[in-house]
Amino acid sequence: MKLIRFTTTDSPNPCFGVVVRDQAVPLAVLQSKAGKSSPHLTDSRSYLANLPDSERAAKEVCAWGEQHLGELGKNECFPLNAVRLLEPVEVAALFDFGLTPRHLKNSAETLMKYEKDNPQTAPMLQAFANALLAPKPKPVPGRPEPLPYYKCNMNTIAGDGETVPWPAYTSRLDVEPELAVVYGNEKQPVAGFCIFNDISARDVQATEFVGGFCLTKDMAKGNQLGPYLVTLDEVGDPYNLKVTVVVNGHAKYQGSTSEVSHKAEDVFAWLGFMAHPKPGSVIGFGTIPDCTGLDHDDFIDPGAEIQVTFERLGTLRCRFAEPTGKLLPSRWPVRPQMQKYHV
């Protein structure tokens, strides 16, 4: 089952629904037509808080919709390509873990390429690179394995098909495709999976390793989630999905979720050791190796149309806008494609 939140051209109010074939259908409509009534399908918060009962109820009316889609009227179902897909759940918290070691190694190499002569950042980056190679500390009895993460800007969450304003402070805007899990509740921790595109400004990143990522990660519409919340039965093995990034119609990056080092139960255990996650908490596992400009030192230009596709999870689209004015001086050499924005 693919759960969605969407708006239509006639209504700006978010609607909680499901995908039935190629249609976005409100769960309220399906319940009414199927003669069912569950208090847990009114919105994503209620759905997540009441798993697994809510999932069973949603699947029941979704099955009815598959059989009777033709009976729904014009204002009861909507072509997917005619609605605006929002982030698939009302997000309670957004955490981003670093559980893809090869991406971290690749990133350190590219960052060091440009920062090696900087006395402020080079020692820190070298220490980071050395830490990646260090043996893991011995487990502490009674404590889950510590896993590195940072907390994301809740004010910059966006859904599918958004245009990302190009920040004036960067010449290297980048995608970061990640597998994300949505937390349900203690009865059913895994509500499902979605795509997380953690858009990043690379030429300011090295300066923020100590205090935390601000300029690097907190740009408008920089935390993209979607296009659906896919339940586990449709995902299969979430840790063995092909990933492709298409830019302007051409495949640019490819990777796999098989390089994620830990599973959902591991991140839930570590978060729960400090405080239990709330329903609707979204956790990114880490950037898929080989799927960013930073991995290859090969970046995306302004105006690009981008499609991030995860096998079984769908395609999350965005566009990098053209800068609206002159860009600020970059800490790194300016790429030829960006020269015109610095004149």
Language-model features and meaning:
Residues 37, 207, 211, 215, ...:
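Glycine-rich active-site loops that engage anionic ligands at enzyme catalytic sites
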Residues 263-301:
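A conserved acidic, glycine/proline-rich C-terminal tail/linker
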Residues 154, 199, 288-289, 312:
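Acidic, glycine-rich active-site loops and adjacent beta-strand->loop/helix elements
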Residues 4-8, 39-247, 251, 339-343:
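Active-site microenvironments in enzyme catalytic cores
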Residues 248, 285-286, 311:
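Generic beta-strand/beta-sheet core signal
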Residues 1-35, 208, 215-229, 258, ...:
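Charged, cofactor-coupling segments
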Residues 16, 180, 274:
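Short, surface-exposed charged micro-motifs
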